[in-house]
A protein has these predicted regions:
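Intrinsically disordered cytoplasmic terminal tails of membrane proteins
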Residues: 1-23
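Short, low-complexity patches enriched in S/T/P/G
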Residues: 21-33
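Short, low-complexity N-terminal intrinsically disordered segments enriched in polar/charged residues
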Residues: 31-90, 191-195
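A solvent-exposed, acidic/Ser-Thr-rich amphipathic alpha-helical stretch
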Residues: 80-85, 89-133, 138
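Short beta-strand edge/turn micro-motifs at domain boundaries
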Residues: 132, 158-186
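Exposed beta-sheet edge and beta->alpha loop/turn motif
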Residues: 138-169
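A short, polar/proline- and glycine-enriched secondary-structure boundary/capping micro-motif
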Residues: 145-148, 183-189
Length: 195
């Protein structure tokens, strides 16, 4: 680098730019254009990151809404045709219920319908991360059909259940659940107690 190309410390003015009175006016313009280019790139990158974050939040909310709709339509509204559309045809339930398709899952819901009436589901917690949705629900229902050899008692029972769902492209593909079967059975066997 020759002396005419080099920027000397005494050529820089108070604003941090090369003094206009120096021989290096062209270099001053190059710095300004370079800074302008960097600023434009940073703005574009920021906009892209905001859009990606917004899209992730939209997907997370859609996944949460899907899981909520599954419980509301499956247990409360008994809209089984709609529930079929919420799950993949090869839906896989890792819980003891062992549904291996969306049709199996709906058949389980239909079995529950024969045993219980006036079912309400309160979503207590709903946590979403990436393609996973964790739900904690409180069920309240009337025992109106035979369950595990126990004839209908008319009792209202309540219990909490946990369920984790994997959602891909807006469809539930897998689930892992905990249902307190023993607690439910104990409530049904107790005489004249409502829960």
């Amino acid at each position: 680098m020759t002396e005419t190309e080099a920027v000397k410390l005494n050529d820089i003015n108070e604003e941090g730019l090369i003094d206009k009175n120096t021989k290096n006016k062209g270099l001053n313009n190059k710095i300004v254009y370079s800074l302008f280019g960097v600023i434009i790139v940073l703005i574009i990158a920021g906009v892209i990151l905001l859009l990606l974050h917004k899209n992730k939040n939209d997907t997370t909310q859609k996944n949460a809404d899907l899981v909520t709709a599954f419980f509301k339509d499956g247990y409360e509204n008994k809209n089984f045709d709609k529930v079929l559309t919420y799950m993949a045809k090869d839906y896989y339930d890792h819980s003891p219920a062992s549904a291996r398709s969306n049709v199996d899952a709906v058949n389980i819901l239909k079995t529950v319908e024969k045993m219980y009436s006036n079912v309400t589901v309160e979503m207590l917690d709903l946590t979403c991360q990436n393609d996973m949705v964790a739900a904690r629900m409180k069920f309240r229902m009337v025992h109106s059909g035979e369950v595990s050899g126990i004839p209908a008692t008319g009792k209202t029972i309540t219990f909490e259940a946990l369920e984790n769902f994997k959602v891909v492209n807006g469809i539930i593909v897998e689930s892992w659940g905990y249902w307190p079967d023993k607690q439910i059975e104990e409530q049904l066997k107790k005489k004249n107690e409502q829960y």
